[in-house]
Each structure stands twice: as C-alpha cells, then as structure tokens.
Amino acid sequence: MKRIFVFFLLSLTLLMTTFPSKSLSAETIKWYPYEEGMTLGKSQHKKIFINFFAEWCGYCTKMDKGTFVDPEIVSYLNKNFIAIKVNADKENTLSTRYKVRGLPSNWFVSDSGDQIGNFPGYIPADNLLPILKYIQTDSYKQMAFKDFMNVK
C-alpha cells in the first residue's frame, strides 16, 4: 500500500511539472464589473476599455482565448486602462446605452465617462494593440485611425 501511495505521489508530481498551468504563471487582464470599473477610471484618471460579450458568442470566446491572453495586450491594458467586461445578455440597460448591435463590441470611454468610440467585432491581438495605443495617447483627438497607422 505504501508503494502505491509513493508511486501515486511521484506520478502526480511528474504530471504537474510536465504540464504547468498557464493560469498560475501568466498575468491576466484585471477585469472589473461596470460600476466599479467606471469609478476606478475616474479616480485613477485612466481611460476605460469595455468588452461586451455573450456566452454563446463564438468570436467573444475567440477573443478571450486569443486576444485577451496575449502578453502584450494583457500588459498594456492592465497598465494603461481600466478593463470592464459586460455580459450583454445580462446587462440589457448597458447594452442599450452603448448601442451594442453585435458581439463582441469593444468600447473606449474617457475617465470622466464620455464615450470615445467603438471598435465592434472580433479584434486579433496584433490589431488591438495599435488601437489601444491610438486611444491611450489621445491620438484620436488629432487624427483618424488610418492616419495614426501610417505615422507609426
């Protein structure tokens, strides 16, 4: 019996070291509920990124498993924005306020709560990073996004 227990422990240890959990070692986006995130945005003077999603939405899941785990996206969002995740099916009032017509819907809001703009639909990580920089640097106040991309 003792040998079986030792064998089990060794096997478990080997299994845990062979397949480390990503969630234990990787940084993740700090998502806030809507009201808390809006309050934090104002108090920390940070712009707000709002991701409207639904559990049935395939592209929302694709963003969760791809875009929102990309280390550059995670780092940039956590450092420069307050990130809010809103389930569009459960938060009808917010979905109406932001005129969400399709999912995913990605909104940017100023620290004072003014809507800056919406980038609807699935956005891969390599496309989202320049959008984040465009909004965070206030370049949206001086130029169109396509012009921002040409200047970079």
Which residues are covered by each model-predicted region?
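Positively charged n-region of N-terminal signal peptides that target proteins for export
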Residues: 1-4
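Bacterial N-terminal signal peptides
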Residues: 7-17
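Sec/Tat signal peptide C-region and signal peptidase I cleavage site
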Residues: 19-26
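Thiol-based oxidoreductase modules, predominantly thioredoxin-like and allied folds used
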Residues: 28-32, 68-92
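A short beta-strand-turn-helix
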Residues: 30-46, 77
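Short active-site neighborhood of thiol/selenol oxidoreductases, capturing the structured segment around
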Residues: 44-57
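Structural micro-motif
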Residues: 47, 98-109
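Non-catalytic, surface beta->alpha helical segment in thiol-disulfide oxidoreductase systems
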Residues: 105-143
